[in-house]
């Protein structure tokens, strides 16, 4: 999520971020609307209140390990392409292009549909539209905001900052009302049927909520005295995130209980309804819908740039890469992206749990490429032993090995504990393999898949 010629651009590096700036940006990148939906799915996959809180702490520690590995890669190989560039250097252009396909067809479109479902779940709290209301809201929101982006829109970093403030404000409200509000204590949680609990599945939803840490690692390129400060930034940011998420989940647990969480599709609204009445539920639902609208708009805006760049790298479907000069947008890419996202919404509507289906759709592909990036760090260390490393991951090779083992387990869990949506995601990834036959022969290895004439400023 995150320039017009498909060439490498060398720029004069400027270091503008203080340690405080970087911590604030990291927290802003990671804190998102997932925390208002995933707790119920985590609760459904753990056996006890202790395990429910423990997985959120574990998720934060895994986030820190991954961010430290990414910090070395982004410092040693600074480039706007991120994972695309790392994969190009470690494995060659075909693997990187397959990642570009995966990002455009699975990861980004799945994220769009997932955000739309969160929007739909909370919009349905305000104006119910029946059992398929969340899916209907999700589809309408994708169509509306794709149309807005086709016409052309200005992305404002101040708008994104405001939305982050709303999200953190909603979390703060959950914590304050949950810990200090008055409500009848929830009943003890019923035992799950044997075999129902799956820590691996719970961790998938937890780590989704912590998503954004891989973007935070790219702060290395703009951080003052990065070799000394990046680890401190990542550790402090992670501690803040763990505190935010653990406090929010303790608050939710204290009001709704484990069974109440398991039964809820809108945990923040249901919690506020118990401690502050319908007015409280309405206010927090409006705040989350507004934040979801902003997130959805930004995700749609950046996602279509992937299709634009893929068309620049491939000879197939060149019209997808056409830039609409009138609206200053990749209109065809936006339309294709919306079609794929709407198909995913339809799949989610059939399963009757759209957000969960979107997580299952994207998780195996996401964790598979994350594993390749982790292995790539070791590959590049071995292949380029004399390369200057502005920042070195601590406890090498233990830290990247631990990261790779975690990614491998998450890849296994995302296939073993999920439904048919995960197989659909893997099938879509496999369908992209023949497209490599249509790649342009003179594209530069450094070309990122998110290259576009106008980048999102967040």
Regions found by a protein language model. Name each.
Residues 43-48, 118-134, 154-163, 283, ...:
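Transmembrane helix-loop boundary segments of multi-pass membrane transporters
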Residues 85-86, 92, 124-129, 233-300, ...:
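TM-loop-TM module centered on a large, flexible mid-protein loop between adjacent transmembrane helices
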Residues 120, 133-181, 193-196, 234-235, ...:
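Membrane-interface loop-to-helix entry segments
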Residues 159, 320-327, 370-419:
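C-terminal membrane-solvent junction of multi-pass transporters and transport-like membrane proteins
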């Amino acid at each position: 999520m995150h320039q017009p010629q498909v060439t490498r651009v060398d720029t004069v590096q400027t270091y503008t971020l203080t340690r405080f700036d970087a911590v604030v940006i990291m927290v802003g990148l990671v804190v998102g609307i997932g925390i208002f939906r995933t707790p119920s799915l985590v609760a459904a996959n753990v056996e006890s209140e202790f395990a429910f809180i423990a997985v959120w702490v574990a998720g934060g520690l895994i986030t820190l390990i991954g961010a430290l590995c990414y910090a070395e890669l982004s410092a040693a190989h600074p480039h706007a392409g991120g994972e695309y560039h790392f994969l190009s250097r470690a494995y060659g252009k075909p693997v990187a292009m397959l990642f570009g396909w995966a990002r455009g067809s699975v990861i980004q479109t799945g994220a769009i549909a997932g955000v739309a479902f969160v929007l739909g779940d909370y919009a349905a709290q305000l104006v119910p539209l029946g059992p398929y209301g969340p899916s209907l809201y999700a589809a309408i929101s994708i169509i509306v905001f794709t149309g807005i982006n086709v016409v052309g829109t200005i992305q404002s970093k101040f708008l994104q900052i405001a939305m982050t403030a709303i999200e953190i404000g909603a979390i703060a409200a959950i914590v304050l009302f949950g810990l200090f509000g008055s409500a009848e204590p929830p009943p003890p949680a019923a035992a799950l049927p044997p075999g129902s609990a799956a820590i691996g599945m719970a961790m998938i939803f937890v780590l989704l909520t912590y998503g954004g840490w891989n973007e935070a690692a790219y702060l290395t390129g703009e951080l003052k005295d990065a070799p000394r400060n990046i680890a401190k930034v990542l550790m402090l940011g992670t501690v803040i995130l763990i505190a935010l998420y653990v406090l929010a989940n303790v608050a939710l647990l204290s009001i709704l209980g484990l069974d109440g969480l398991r039964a809820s599709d809108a945990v923040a609204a249901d919690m506020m309804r118990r401690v502050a009445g319908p007015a409280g539920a309405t206010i927090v639902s409006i705040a989350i819908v507004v934040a979801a609208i902003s997130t959805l708009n930004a995700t749609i805006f950046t996602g279509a740039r992937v299709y634009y760049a893929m068309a620049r790298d491939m000879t197939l479907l060149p019209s997808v890469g056409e830039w609409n000069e009138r609206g200053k947008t990749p209109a065809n890419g936006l339309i294709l992206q919306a079609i794929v996202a709407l198909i995913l919404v339809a799949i989610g509507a059939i399963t009757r749990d759209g957000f969960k289906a979107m997580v299952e759709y994207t998780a195996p592909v996401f964790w598979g490429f994350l594993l390749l990036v982790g292995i790539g760090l070791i590959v590049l260390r071995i292949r380029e032993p004399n390369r200057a490393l502005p920042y070195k991951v601590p406890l090498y090779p233990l830290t990247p090995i631990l990261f790779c083992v975690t990614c491998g387990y998450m890849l296994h869990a995302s296939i073993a504990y999920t439904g048919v949506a995960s197989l659909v995601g893997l099938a879509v990834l496999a369908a992209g393999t023949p497209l490599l036959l249509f790649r342009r022969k003179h594209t530069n290895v450094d070309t990122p898949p998110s290259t576009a004439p106008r980048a999102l400023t967040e």
